[in-house]
Amino acid sequence: MVFLLCFFLVADVSYGINGDCELPKVVGPCRASHPRYYYNSSSKRCEKFNYGGCRGNANNFHTLEECEKVCGVRSRDSPKEN
């Protein structure tokens, strides 16, 4: 019984963040400049960046609120500019 409890606690911590949120920031090769947000796994915050418009990945959100909701960010610090 203790083993199962430990297993679920570890699983909860390990998988608490959506896997897409662990992807690196990808600006992409196109030349557009769309303001977007991505989850920075080092700072554990959603940060603003300019998306080029193509060949990005799933760690790319239209709003800070969407990024925080999907990636489980608890504190609402001001976003770090990149």
Curated annotation (Swiss-Prot):
Gene3D superfamilies for the chain: Pancreatic trypsin inhibitor Kunitz domain
Alphabetical UniProt keywords: Disulfide bond, Ion channel impairing toxin, Nematocyst, Potassium channel impairing toxin, Protease inhibitor, Secreted, Serine protease inhibitor, Signal, Toxin, Voltage-gated potassium channel impairing toxin
Annotated site (Reactive bond): R31, A32
Stated name of the protein: U-actitoxin-Avd3p
Entry's Gene Ontology cellular component terms: extracellular region; nematocyst
Localisation per UniProt entry: Secreted; Nematocyst
Disulfide cross-links: C21-C71, C30-C54, C46-C67
Signal peptide: 1-16
Domain BPTI/Kunitz inhibitor: 21-71
Protein source organism: Anemonia viridis (Snakelocks anemone)
A single GO molecular function term of this UniProt record: potassium channel regulator activity
Pfam families the UniProt entry points to: Kunitz_BPTI (PF00014)
Propeptide: 76-82
Family: Belongs to the venom Kunitz-type family. Sea anemone type 2 potassium channel toxin subfamily.
Database matches in InterPro entries: Kunitz_BPTI, Kunitz_BPTI_sf, Prtase_inh_Kunz-CS, TFPI/VKTCI-like
Chief location of this protein within or outside the cell: secreted
Summary of the function given for this chain in its UniProt record: Serine protease inhibitor that inhibits both tissue and plasma kallikreins. Has hemolytic activity. Inhibits voltage-gated potassium channels (Kv).
